[in-house]
From Swiss-Prot:
Gene Ontology biological process terms, A to Z: positive regulation of translation
Name of the protein in question: Elongation factor 4
EC number: 3.6.5.n1
GO cellular component terms attached to this protein's record: plasma membrane
Keyword entries, A-Z: Cell inner membrane, Cell membrane, GTP-binding, Hydrolase, Membrane, Nucleotide-binding, Protein biosynthesis
Pfam families named in the record: EFG_C, GTP_EFTU, GTP_EFTU_D2, LepA_C
The tr-type G domain, residue ranges: 2-184
Compartment list: Cell inner membrane
């Protein structure tokens, strides 16, 4: 056991986590040079295309150190995005230490901090590594000072390496062996294994990635899942080297996979504990805290026949992505679908893209909303994440919106732009500290503003240099109202949104004008209105197409023409009563893109 090292690689987006893991795999001979591909561990196509890591992946390597001993390194490559920070905390639960990778050119960024603090809270040993020292703009001295100054861990003798060219990779491996502690646990005790991750394989059923805390799990053992009490047989156990490699047993301190032919999707939930069916452990390990979704949106299949396959797809995805929450929803405009909870907008985009690619579905998304706390006049408190569930205005005593604490790191030349943006988003400044060339800003912002397009706007006002991380702190009373869109006097539930009172006029007008462009002309006039309660605040009309009914009259009496025109008028009136207007897909998307 003293030769096992479990660690995660944590870093800000694009500081070279995945490339560093590629080098470690190559150095330890996990894959031959022929099998190496850039970003070996980013197994999804989306990950490769966008160049981001979404799922944490684990690898087991053997490394012969300079002291002549062979060490088993289990490491987990983690995502860097704010939206996936829970993936990071999950990976850390399986480790004793973490490599904090910092780009020697960019320096410390917000996500570096956030992930590092997560690790320190879990009593991890954090080992700083300065990456990209081959770049002309690399300044390892300055960055080492920054790490000590902002993060507060020793970095004077941090390892310097370049994952791209392979300089210093040996040193990284030596530091891992020297500085990261070996796992603790009782090899003789009853089995306790923590499920770090699970995914569904259509041939093998559920594949679970586990970390053995105590005891030994052998192939063919009968084990039970502690939360459900179900018993299974361990058909295959093994490790990823990154290829799936079967072994006969997983010992205390090791990280590996287990396949037990579990067919029901929620058979082995992430964060659960496995133990032997006979003489097992009495109590489960401390799992992970359940992540609460921050953003909700409705997703609807374009053709109603896809509803069942959509549900299956969601079930399979939720096994792999423990933060996904969904419940059935119906909309008069869009039919049957699901209300889905996400961790942020990037997460939402990725999930939608995975559903469309991996499961061949065509989906419509409604505007994302956050959760509001509402105190009704009866004194009851409810939580609403769907604008159409909002009680009538006269039943609401008080509406409270979620506030997040946002930490932004920005080079000082862009400070002004960023402050202007935060003020525009109704932010309250809490703190401002200078660290050398960087400024650390702390703002309290309404989550609804952060979720919509804050990240993109922040990047564009700071030329991509600012970075942010945020977490929910509390609900705060706010003047929020529901804005409805009426088409010919009928509410379109999928277009409703909850917004701040100060924005109704501008948002209402913008929406109405956008709808006017996007809804095709019909044979009768269409009124598009924006309303709050019963008060109409903006309106525009889509004019009818007309047929020239008098074209066939040459000369003759004017009353003949009048008769034909009146007949047309009657027909249009009748049509307007029964005619319904199809709202095209683009109109729903327009709500999301209103700020452009």
């Amino acid at each position: 056991m003293k030769h096992i090292r479990n660690f995660s690689i944590i870093a800000h987006i694009d500081h070279g986590k995945s490339t560093l893991s590629d080098r470690l795999i190559q150095e330890c001979g996990g894959l031959s040079d022929r099998e190496m591909a850039a970003q070996v561990l980013d197994s999804m196509d989306i990950e490769r295309e966008r160049g981001i890591t979404i799922k944490a992946q684990s690898v087991t390597l053997d490394y012969k150190a300079q002291d002549g001993e062979t060490y088993q390194l289990n490491f987990i490559d983690t995502p860097g995005h704010v939206d996936f920070s829970y993936e990071v905390s999950r990976s850390l639960a399986a480790c004793e230490g973490a490599l904090l990778v910092v780009d020697a050119g960019q320096g410390v960024e917000a996500q570096t901090l956030a992930n590092c603090y997560t690790a320190l809270e879990m009593d991890m040993d954090v080992v700083p590594v300065l990456n990209k020292i081959d770049l002309p703009q690399a300044d390892p001295e300055r960055v080492a000072d920054e790490i000590e100054d902002i993060v507060g861990i020793e970095a004077a003798d941090a390892v310097r390496c370049s994952a791209k060219t392979g300089i210093g990779i040996k040193d990284v491996l030596e530091v891992i062996v020297a500085q990261i502690p070996s796992p603790e646990g009782d090899p003789e005790g009853p089995l306790q294994a923590l499920i770090i991750d699970s995914w569904f394989d259509s041939y093998q059923g559920v594949v679970s990635l586990v970390r053995i805390k105590n005891g030994v799990l052998r192939k063919g053992d009968k084990f039970k899942v502690m939360s459900t009490g179900q018993n299974y047989n361990a058909d295959r156990v093994g490790i990823f080297t990154p290829k799936q490699t079967d072994t006969t047993e997983l010992k205390t301190g090791e990280v590996g996979f287990i396949i037990a032919g579990i067919k029901e999707i929620h058979g082995a939930p992430v964060g659960d504990t496995l133990t032997h069916a006979k003489h097992g452990a009495d109590k489960p390990l401390a799992g992970f805290k359940k992540v609460k979704p921050q953003v909700y949106a409705g997703l609807f299949p374009i053709s109603t026949d896809d509803y069942e396959s959509f549900r299956d797809a969601l079930n399979k995805l939720s096994l792999n992505d423990a933060s996904l929450f969904f419940e059935p929803e119906t909309s008069s405009a869009l039919g049957f679908g699901f209300r889905i909870g996400f961790l942020g907008l990037l997460h939402m985009e990725i999930i939608q893209e995975r559903l469309e690619r991996e499961y061949n579905l065509d989906l419509i998304t409604t505007a994302p909303t956050v959760v509001y706390e509402i105190v009704k006049t009866s004194g009851e408190t409810i939580y609403v994440d769907n604008p159409s569930d909002l009680p009538a205005i006269n039943n609401i005593e008080e509406m409270r919106e979620p506030i997040v604490e946002t930490n932004i790191l920005v080079p000082k030349e862009y400070l002004g732009n960023v402050i202007t943006l935060c003020v525009e988003k109704r932010g309250v400044q809490k703190n401002l500290v200078y660290h050398g060339n960087q400024v650390a800003l702390t703002y309290e912002l309404p989550m609804a503003e952060v979720v919509m397009d804050f990240f993109d706007r922040l990047k564009s006002t700071s030329r991509g240099y600012a970075s942010l991380e945020y977490n929910f702190i509390r609900f705060e009373p706010a003047d929020m109202v529901r804005l409805d869109i009426l088409i010919n006097g009928d509410r379109v539930d999928a277009l409703a949104m909850i917004i701040h009172k100060g924005l109704i006029r501008s948002k209402g007008l913008a929406l109405v004008n956008k709808m006017k462009e996007l809804i095709p002309r019909q044979m009768f006039d269409i009124a598009v209105q924006a309303a709050v309660g019963s008060q109409i605040i903006a309106r525009s009309s889509i004019k009818a197409m007309r047929k020239d009914v008098t074209a066939k009259c040459y000369g003759g009496d004017v009353s003949r023409k009048k008769k034909l025109l009146n007949k047309q008028k009657e027909g249009k009136k009748r049509m307007k009563q029964v005619g319904n207007v199809e709202v095209p897909q683009e109109a729903f998307l327009a709500v999301l893109k209103l700020n452009d």
